[in-house]
Amino acid sequence: MMELEADRMANLKLDAKEFSPELKVVMEERRMRTEDNPHALVYERLNSVAFQAHPYRRPVIGWMNDLDNMTVADTQNWYHSWYAPNNATLVVVGDVDHETLFHLAEKYYGGIKSHTLPQRRPLVEPEQLGIKRLSVKAPAKLPYLAMAWKVPKLKDIDKDRDPYALQMLAAVLDGHEASRLAKNLVRGQKIAQSAGAGYDAALRGESLFILDGQPAEGHTIGELEAALRGEIRRIQESGVTAEELARVKTQTIAGQIYKRDSMMGQAMEI
């Protein structure tokens, strides 16, 4: 496996005859996962509105127009620009002997030359001067709401406080069946059919804190938005209970431990 991956890093040849059918597969994947999926479509457009200068505004798979106009040369140029050992990390997990592993890595990757990578420019967003709103028209049985706030990412694991607080906030709102959104909006007021919160601290650029959900039958997007904002306001005014905080801390620690149960989980964590 290591020999094959090393060869692919150094000697990949892209063939025009193979490229065209593979590109069609990617285009169909985009249609299935995004264009025919109202929730995914909402989040794609949310990112395009939330971010003005950062590459996060563009979907990873690209817009359909990008795929329509992509050539073998585009792909080959990208490969030559970024596929290099000085831009790669080799992760191996499992029952391996580290001395043997280092020997194999040196054998197969050691001869691949490094090269100068394209310059990475600062990824700084211009100041946002007001609320941005977007309506997405797509076939769906129920309307769907997503709200996002630009928030700090984790830069210094020892000094940063806000990212950890945001993780706890997301868990208090949507970490378990007894969390506030499920308890108050879904089962309590019955305003929402579903409601959630999310935050990712480990990003290169700015992160987003997200609240989302679907209104219950007979309720509107406006009512759901007001209810979600109301839950945030209650925490701002009254905080969270000691019991809530203890529970989500325990859940967060347990989640980190459970990642070690699978090889893939360990590899992705590294």
For each predicted feature, which ranges?
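Active-site-adjacent, His/Asp/Glu-enriched structural segments that form or flank metal-binding
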Residues: M1-A40, H54-P55, D66-N87, D97-T100, ...
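Bilobed periplasmic-binding protein/Venus flytrap-like ligand-binding cleft at the lobe interface
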Residues: L166-H176, L228-I235
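Short beta-strand/turn micro-motifs at beta-sheet edges
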Residues: Q76-H80, K132-V136, A195-A201
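An aromatic/glycine/proline-enriched structural segment found at the starts
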Residues: Q52, V60, T89-K155, K259-R260
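Active/ligand-binding-proximal structured segments within catalytic/core domains
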Residues: D158-L173, A182-K183
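M16 family metallopeptidases and their MPP-like homologs
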Residues: M1-M9, P38-N65, N87-V93, P143-D156, ...
